[in-house]
């Protein structure tokens, strides 16, 4: 009911009625694309050449013109024109960039070749692009997880998504990204340990097959995550000496002492 009420209110965007309330349930069946600004939904669909989705969004009176902002191949352009698209002028593109709702995403979809602000002009383009990637992925994790598949293309992008999903306990997203990333265990261990996040740590172990609890203990020691070190010991980790040395090297003296105490307990248990 809350979702329906939200979508009812969302049917008005930029002062214009985008769709009728009677179509809300149909939209829910369309993978929640309406939970983000309508122009962005069209742009994302166009980026991955999802013609069926573009057509359905167009039928809901979401302008096909937005698709032309992010496509450059002839077949997709022809498809947009067949639906009545009008090629946006340079002035219209600049006007869109002034809309804070989705201008960062627009720049990213254009491979970070948008119009940087004066403050950004001295920042290398690859740095700007990386910042935009993080912003977009973080926003999509909170607002519309099903769209992640459309914007996550590289190993680095999946690593960002894993990091944010773990940091904010977005477990369904975490599991999706885990399956796509080859470095997922390393990324998650660092995030879970730095944030001392036991829920994330559990998923890392249960679903990722993080059988190397010794490596997890050392990573936890870097971040003074004593609770996670305890957890690793309970699950069979025994690399306390290395964890103690690591904690000391990172300046976590109390953590190092904690590892030393745990070592004595383990020795006592085995006698």
From Swiss-Prot:
Induction: Expressed in the early phase of the viral replicative cycle. It comes from the Viruses. Keywords: Early protein. Belongs to the asfivirus MGF 360 family. Plays a role in virus cell tropism, and may be required for efficient virus replication in macrophages. This is Protein MGF 360-15R. The lineage of its organism: Viruses, Varidnaviria, Bamfordvirae, Nucleocytoviricota, Pokkesviricetes.
């Amino acid at each position: 009911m809350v979702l329906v009420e939200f979508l009812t209110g969302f049917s008005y965007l930029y002062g214009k009625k985008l769709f009728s309330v009677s179509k809300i349930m149909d939209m829910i069946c369309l993978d929640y694309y309406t939970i983000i600004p309508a122009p962005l939904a069209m742009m994302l669909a166009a980026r991955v050449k999802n013609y069926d989705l573009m057509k359905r969004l167009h039928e809901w009176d979401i302008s096909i013109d937005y698709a032309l902002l992010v496509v450059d191949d002839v077949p997709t352009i022809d498809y947009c024109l067949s639906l009545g698209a009008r090629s946006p002028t340079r002035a219209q593109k600049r006007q869109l960039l002034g809309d804070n709702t989705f201008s960062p995403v627009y720049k990213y979809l254009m491979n970070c070749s948008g119009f940087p602000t004066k403050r950004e002009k001295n920042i290398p383009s690859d740095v700007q692009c990386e910042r935009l990637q993080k912003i977009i992925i973080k926003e999509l994790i909170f607002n519309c997880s099903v769209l992640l598949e459309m914007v996550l293309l590289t190993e680095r992008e999946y690593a960002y998504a894993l990091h944010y999903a773990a940091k904010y306990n977005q477990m369904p997203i975490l599991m999706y990204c885990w399956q796509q990333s080859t470095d997922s265990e390393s990324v998650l261990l660092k995030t879970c340990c730095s944030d001392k996040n036991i829920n994330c740590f559990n998923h890392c172990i249960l679903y990722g097959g993080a059988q190397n609890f010794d490596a997890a203990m050392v990573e936890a020691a870097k971040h003074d995550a004593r609770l996670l070190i305890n957890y690793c010991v309970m699950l069979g980790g025994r690399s306390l000496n290395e964890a103690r040395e690591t904690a000391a090297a990172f300046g976590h003296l109390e953590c190092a002492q904690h590892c030393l105490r745990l070592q004595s307990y383990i020795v006592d248990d085995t006698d």
